[in-house]
Amino acid sequence: MAEEGSPAGGVMDVNTALPEVLKTALIHDGLAPGIREAAKALDKRQAHLCVLAANCDEPMYVKLVEALCAEHQINLIKVDDNKKLGEWVGLCKIDREGKPRKVVGCSCVVVKDYGKESQAKDVIEEYFKSKK
C-alpha cells in the first residue's frame, strides 16, 4: 500500500501505471471510450491497448471485446470496477476539492494513442512482454 501513493519515487506497478496512461491518452485525445467506439477502433486495428471492466453487466460486450482483442493481437487489461474506469477516462465532474463526483461507469476503453512516452507506458508494455 505504501508504494501505491508514491509512483514517482519507487517502482511503478501496473495498477498505478494504468490510470496515468489513460489520463495522458485522454489529454492527447487518444481514447475511445464505450463499446461502440472501442469496437470500431479494435476492428480498424487502431488500438494499442484495451481496458475492460470485469463487472460489465452485459456478457456479450465482454465476449465481443475479448474476441476482437484476440483476433487482432491487441493487449487486454481487465479492471475490477467500471466506475473506477469511468473516473480514469474523465467521465465525471470534478468538484472544488478536486474529488470526482457524478462518475459514469465505463465498461470498455481503447487507447489509440498513448500521447507521449512515459514511465507508466513502459511499465504497461513490460507487463505484456512478461505475459507472453
From Swiss-Prot:
Keywords: Ribonucleoprotein, Ribosomal protein
SUPFAM superfamilies: L30e-like (SSF55315)
Any single Pfam family the record assigns to this protein: Ribosomal_L7Ae
GO biological process entries: translation
Highest taxon listed in the record's lineage: Eukaryota
PROSITE patterns the UniProt entry points to: RIBOSOMAL_S12E
UniProt cross-references to InterPro entries, sorted A to Z: Ribosomal_eL30-like_sf, Ribosomal_eL8/eL30/eS12/Gad45, Ribosomal_eS12, Ribosomal_eS12_CS
Family to which this protein belongs: Belongs to the eukaryotic ribosomal protein eS12 family.
Full protein name: Small ribosomal subunit protein eS12
Organism: Oreochromis niloticus (Nile tilapia)
Taxonomic classification: Eukaryota, Metazoa, Chordata, Craniata, Vertebrata
